[in-house]
Every structure is written in C-alpha cells, then in structure tokens.
C-alpha cells in the first residue's frame, strides 16, 4: 500500500475513489451522468459471483458422506447456519428464500472482502493495461447496493401479491394502521414504510464499505513504517465489519420477505 509520488494526497484519494466508467450514450469511457455504467463494479461483481458458483459446484460434485474435506466442511457449515437463520425468521416455504439468503450472504461477503486487498494492487494491474481508474470494491459503489436493494424490494412486492392477493393487499394498505376512516394517511404511511426499506438497505452497506475503503486509502498515504501496524489493526477490525454487513443485508432481506409473506 503505497502512494504514487506524482500525485498529491487529494489527487491520490480522488484517483482511487474514481470508477472506470462507460458512457451508454456513445459507448466511450467518459462520464455519461445517469447513463453511466461502472465497468469495474460490473467486472468484479460478476467475477466474484462466477467464482462463488464455481466453488460451490465443484465442492458439490466432489461431496462425500464419509470423510468430508475442508472445503466441504466450510460450505456445509455456511449452508446449515444460513438455513437455520432463515428457518427462525421465515415460516413459509423456504425453497426459494434459503438459497437466496445463502447467495446474498456469500456474494456480498466476497464483494466486501475486496476491501481487504491492498488499495494499489488491482488499480495498478489495470493501469498496466491502459485503464486509468479502477475501483475494486463493488459494495462501495451505490449503484450496485441500490440495484441489490431494489431487487429485494421487487421480491417483497412479489411475496405480498403471492400470499395476500391483489384484493387482500389493497385492503391491508388502505386499512392499516389507523383503520378505514383514515385511508389517505394509511396509504402515505405504507408508501413511506416501503420506500425507506430499499434506501436504508442500500445506504447501510454502501456507507460502511465506502468508509472502510477510504480509511485504507488514507493509511496508504502515511509513512511506510506506520502503514503495516495501522493497516493490520484496521484489517482485523474491518474483517468483522464486512462479515457483519453481509449478514445484516441477508437478514434484513429475509425479514422483509417474511413480513410480506405473512397472511393476515
């Protein structure tokens, strides 16, 4: 973790917090405002998702009932832990929710884990290929965290309609929490309640990982003799943070779907 000598501290931070952008209007590597695709976020998230699927597939193919290996033990522990958590929170059919929760936890954890990679390593590798900016932590990008939270929001709506039907959901929205006589207020409260969920889900994950990445970058600006000590301390603490944030995102997803699936 070392700073480029030609950059000032402010320029170094700005450089490492900038994305590799694709303008979807003209397909050039420029900022297109709303129509901008962060290629670094897309590449890292897809690669980590593919890695997750590949590892689980290989371990599943080689699974044995006799003497399981280290990878099989680790994956079985993760699957059992997530399934137990889902079982405690979701009391309906878990055939979709449990695999979804496992996928969210592992995928988000892997993306969070990129925050522990030395801040100059991956950007420097891409610079060798002509890419000026590359931000290697997908969950420090609000476009990804909002995309994930909106997907969860869509699932919540789906389960609301599936379990309650259009009429049942309509009655619930119009009559709760203050009764039929205050229908307009009930609708406003429901819109606020549902709208806050994806926003808070996205910003919580983004804020924690963005702050963690920024601290690693600031540590990289310090003298070499202090980088190792502070870097190790922050790495050990941040390892807990990235795990907890992955668990929270998974847990809130399960809770939101469980609340939507409850039949009243």
Swiss-Prot record:
**UniProt keywords, alphabetically:** ATP synthesis, Cell inner membrane, Cell membrane, CF(0), Hydrogen ion transport, Ion transport, Membrane, Transmembrane, Transmembrane helix, Transport
Q: Name one GO molecular function term.
A: proton-transporting ATP synthase activity, rotational mechanism
The record lists the membrane-crossing segments as 39-59, 97-117, 139-159, 205-225, 239-259
Q: What topology in the membrane does the UniProt record assign?
A: Multi-pass membrane protein
Q: List GO terms (cellular component aspect).
A: plasma membrane; proton-transporting ATP synthase complex
Q: Which GO terms describe its biological process?
A: proton motive force-driven plasma membrane ATP synthesis
Q: What PROSITE patterns does the record point to?
A: ATPASE_A
Q: Is this entry keyworded Secreted?
A: no
Pfam family of this protein, just one? ATP-synt_A
Write down the InterPro entries for this protein, in alphabetical order.
ATP_syn_F0_a_bact/chloroplast, ATP_synth_F0_asu, ATP_synth_F0_asu_AS, F0_ATP_A_sf
Q: Is Ion transport there in the keyword field?
A: yes
- Where is the protein situated, by its record's location annotation? Cell inner membrane
Q: What Gene3D superfamilies is this protein classified in?
A: ATP synthase, F0 complex, subunit A (1.20.120.220)
- Which family is this sequence assigned to? Belongs to the ATPase A chain family.
Outline the subunit composition.
F-type ATPases have 2 components, CF(1) - the catalytic core - and CF(0) - the membrane proton channel. CF(1) has five subunits: alpha(3), beta(3), gamma(1), delta(1), epsilon(1). CF(0) has three main subunits: a(1), b(2) and c(9-12). The alpha and beta chains form an alternating ring which encloses part of the gamma chain. CF(1) is attached to CF(0) by a central stalk formed by the gamma and epsilon chains, while a peripheral stalk is formed by the delta and b chains.
Entry function = Key component of the proton channel; it plays a direct role in the translocation of protons across the membrane.
> What is the name of this protein?
ATP synthase subunit a
Source organism: Coxiella burnetii (strain RSA 493 / Nine Mile phase I)
């Amino acid at each position: 973790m070392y700073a480029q000598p030609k950059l000032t501290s402010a320029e170094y931070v700005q450089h490492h917090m900038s994305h590799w952008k694709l303008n979807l209007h003209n397909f050039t590597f420029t900022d297109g405002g709303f129509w901008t695709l962060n290629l670094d976020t897309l590449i890292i998230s897809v690669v980590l998702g593919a890695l997750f699927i590949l590892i689980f597939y290989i371990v599943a193919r080689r699974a044995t009932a006799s003497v399981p290996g280290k990878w099989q033990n680790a994956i079985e522990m993760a699957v059992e832990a997530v399934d137990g958590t889902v079982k405690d929170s979701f009391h309906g059919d878990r055939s979709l929710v449990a695999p979804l929760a496992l996928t969210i936890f592992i995928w988000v954890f892997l993306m969070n884990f990129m925050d522990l990679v030395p801040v100059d390593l991956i950007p420097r590798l891409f610079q060798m290929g002509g890419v000026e900016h590359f931000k290697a932590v997908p969950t420090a990008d609000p476009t990804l965290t909002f995309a994930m939270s909106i997907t969860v929001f869509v699932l919540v709506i789906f389960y609301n309609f599936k379990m309650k039907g259009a009429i049942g959901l309509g009655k619930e929205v119009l009559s709760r929490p203050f009764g039929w006589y205050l229908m307009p207020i009930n609708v406003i409260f429901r819109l606020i309640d549902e709208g806050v969920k994806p926003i808070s889900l996205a910003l919580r994950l983004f804020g924690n990982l963005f702050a963690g990445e920024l601290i690693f970058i600031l540590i990289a600006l310090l003298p070499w003799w202090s980088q190792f000590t502070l870097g190790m301390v922050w790495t050990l603490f941040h390892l807990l943070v990235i795990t907890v944030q992955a668990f929270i995102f998974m847990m809130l997803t399960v809770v939101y779907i469980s609340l939507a699936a409850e039949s009243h």
